[in-house]
Amino acid sequence: MNRMIVNSALGLLCAVLMTACNKPDEPVNPTIDTNPELVAACQHIEGGGANVKGGDGGTIYRVSRLDDEADPNTGLPMAGTLRYAVNQTGARRVVFTTSGTIHLQKELRIKTGSITIDGQTAPGDGICIADYPLVINASNVIVRFIRIRLGDVSNTEADAVSVNNSQGVVLDHLSCSWSVDECVSCYGNTDFTMQYCIVSESLKESIHGKGSHGYGGIWGGTNASFHHNLLAHHDSRNPRFDHDYVNTSCTGPIDFVNNVVYNWGGNSAYGGEGSTNGGGGRHINFVNNYFKPGPSTKSSVKERLVDPWTSCSNCTDRCGGSVTAPKIFLTGNTMTSSASVTSDNWTGSTKSKSVAGTDSRWTNGLTPLTIEQTANEAYETVLTKAGCSLHRDAIDTRIVNDVRNSTGKLINTQSEVGGWPQLQTADKTLDSDYDGMPDEWETQFGLNPKDPMDGKAITLVTGYTNLEVYLRHLVRNLY
């Protein structure tokens, strides 16, 4: 009993002393979840990937150089490069202390998950990846506010970005262009979100061994959300909904909602078929998208929203059986070239509703979007906010102007439009404790700019470290 009394007294004394030793100028953390602006900033990833945390709380790796060199002694990536950070293991966050274009020497593949790449941390104009693709084959991954502009200089027949057979991946505010194959292809994934991305100018008559391409992407998955993206200047696959030849396990449902599609050439959105012995036709919500033909759109397809497929020799070669059409919930889409298609979306489909449609929206197993706009509202939101838009470069600015003004064309090489623009860096804001949060922001929200550990603490918003809250708050106006 005496020991219990002594221990209690000592505990009380320590608490009093600790309180007395707090310096009067040290800020006290506010009660969690009391700032509605910060709470709202943490809710901007929507749909299938809404609960993905990436590398939050993990080791911070700073990208301080723009080369892609290996150590001459070990052959391993040099510290300070993007590849070095990506190739680490464990939970990790990649931030940038410089801006500019990184000309890769080979593909950049994320093979180990629990990683967040925070392009919005780059001072100045931001980061661009060039020459080789970004490939994601891992789970629990967030990539945001990065440009991936492939080009044909490396003679690589590649997508700009591909995500396959992964769980829990978020692509947020990316700007992707100049691919030789598809620009962005994402299929076979579960709990996936691609949002606010600009996918533009895949190369049509380029170096691909199969000849003419110029494709937007192959999109699919299970609990996969594609919303508020811009597809512009692609000949076809705007997008191509995936099929059993590339994946048999993830057959939907998916949300294709609030996207803008501009200046398709030979085909707009299509596909989604499957085999009776495989995954079967895909389950797709095709809702409130905005389609606008452009100068390169063929007259025969200028009023086409979607071309659901009912045949696929590749599917039956792989799986056998017979081919079934997708089941599409098709409603609320705007076709600027046709009031009748806007009024009745099924008149903009190559197949009837009885063949490829459903009366009810797919909801089972699909994380709903918390904010859904009309097609016309989404048009303005996407053109204003999509892409690597914290600092829009000349490429995205031109693409958005093309959409607004009905200009532009399909291209064959990036040199037709000037190639990669120069991205300028700038001075970083003061971060005395080197925790990733500027002193000014920490002071504003009751943190201690001299405490290097409060970035990993969770005191502002439930479920998010303070550093994650800062990084989401930084871009809060771009959603």
Where are these regions (language model features)?
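Bacterial Sec-dependent N-terminal signal peptides
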Residues: L17-P36
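Acidic Gly/Asp/Thr-rich repetitive segments characteristic of extracellular carbohydrate-active
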Residues: A40-V94
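Right-handed parallel beta-helix
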Residues: S114, G119, S139-L150, N165-W178, ...
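Extracellular beta-strand-rich, repetitive "passenger/adhesive" scaffolds
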Residues: Q120-I127, I146, L174, K450-D454
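Extracellular beta-rich repeat passengers
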Residues: R240, C250-S415
